């Protein structure tokens, strides 16, 4: 989860988030190099009145600064496309969970079980226990097995919502009348927090998401107790 005054991204919990963080560093390095070069050239232009006459009308220089940006854009686009295709892949999910957005709560249905469904509301600040997080805790957490591919089917009953868990690299729009899907895979157990990321009304800020990733054995025990 995020902390106050945090400068970097949240710790990656899924393979997709690890790829996104690597892509972020890759792109940031390119931006830093370009910015440094531009600032260096500007500083030279401001500190000297001399001009190279050979660069006033140089075909070679114009060719270089036309081709070089194209190469840089390709170096950014190819890793980006690779990650986009990875995010769309869903390989043999062991579990499917249907997520519906409402004003202003989430409902979940484990489609592999007959009667395993519940609503998830934010816990009011006045009802929080010591150590719980304000505006992020819910009365019913989404319990999922770790280290296994899980398919999330996401839609909405009323207006546009967005189901987002940053540490897992997830952000999928919940659109009325349309069913979007995403893959959830966690490398480690724990609680992972998210929120609705699409302005959906007056209580938009009060639609938290809490995923509880547990070992498969614990998930089986939990699902048996819920049915």
Curated annotation (Swiss-Prot):
Binding site for Mg(2+): 198
Listed name of the protein: Cytochrome c oxidase subunit 2
Family: Belongs to the cytochrome c oxidase subunit 2 family.
TM annotation in the entry: 15-45, 60-87
Stored SUPFAM superfamilies: Cupredoxins, Cytochrome c oxidase subunit II-like, transmembrane region
Underlying gene: MT-CO2
EC number: 7.1.1.9
GO molecular function list: copper ion binding; cytochrome-c oxidase activity
Function summary: Component of the cytochrome c oxidase, the last enzyme in the mitochondrial electron transport chain which drives oxidative phosphorylation. The respiratory chain contains 3 multisubunit complexes succinate dehydrogenase (complex II, CII), ubiquinol-cytochrome c oxidoreductase (cytochrome b-c1 complex, complex III, CIII) and cytochrome c oxidase (complex IV, CIV), that cooperate to transfer electrons derived from NADH and succinate to molecular oxygen, creating an electrochemical gradient over the inner membrane that drives transmembrane transport and the ATP synthase.
Alphabetic keyword roster: Copper, Electron transport, Magnesium, Membrane, Metal-binding, Mitochondrion, Mitochondrion inner membrane, Respiratory chain, Translocase, Transmembrane, Transmembrane helix, Transport
Broad EC category: translocase
NCBIfam families: CoxB
Cofactor binding summary note: Binds a dinuclear copper A center per subunit.
Annotated binding of Cu cation A2, by residue: 196, 198, 200, 204
Cysteine-cysteine disulfides: none
Subcellular localization: Mitochondrion inner membrane
Residues bound to Cu cation A1: 161, 196, 200, 207
Subunit structure: Component of the cytochrome c oxidase (complex IV, CIV), a multisubunit enzyme composed of 14 subunits. The complex is composed of a catalytic core of 3 subunits MT-CO1, MT-CO2 and MT-CO3, encoded in the mitochondrial DNA, and 11 supernumerary subunits COX4I, COX5A, COX5B, COX6A, COX6B, COX6C, COX7A, COX7B, COX7C, COX8 and NDUFA4, which are encoded in the nuclear genome.
Gene3D superfamilies: 1.10.287.90, Cupredoxins - blue copper proteins
Segments on the Mitochondrial matrix side according to the record's topology features: 46-59
């Amino acid at each position: 989860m995020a902390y106050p005054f945090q400068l970097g991204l949240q710790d990656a919990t899924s393979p997709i988030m690890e790829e996104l963080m690597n892509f972020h560093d890759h792109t940031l390095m390119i931006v830093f190099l370009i910015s440094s070069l531009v600032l260096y050239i500007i500083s030279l232009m401001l500190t000297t009145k001399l001009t190279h006459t050979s660069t006033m009308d140089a075909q070679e220089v114009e060719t270089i600064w036309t081709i070089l940006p194209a190469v840089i854009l390709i170096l950014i686009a190819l890793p980006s496309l690779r990650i986009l295709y990875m995010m769309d892949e869903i390989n043999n999910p062991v579990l499917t969970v249907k997520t519906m957005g409402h004003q202003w709560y989430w409902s979940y249905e484990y489609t592999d079980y007959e009667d395993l469904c519940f609503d998830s509301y934010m816990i009011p600040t006045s009802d929080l226990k010591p150590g719980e997080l304000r505006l992020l805790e819910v009365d019913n957490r989404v319990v999922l097995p770790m280290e296994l591919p899980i398919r999330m089917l996401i839609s909405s009953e009323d207006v546009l919502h967005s189901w987002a868990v940053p540490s897992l690299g997830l952000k999928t729009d919940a659109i009325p009348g349309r069913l979007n899907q995403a893959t959830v895979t966690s490398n480690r157990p724990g609680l992972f927090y998210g929120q609705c990321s699409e302005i959906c009304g007056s209580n938009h800020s009060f639609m938290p998401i809490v995923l509880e990733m547990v070992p498969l054995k614990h998930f089986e025990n939990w699902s048996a107790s819920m049915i």
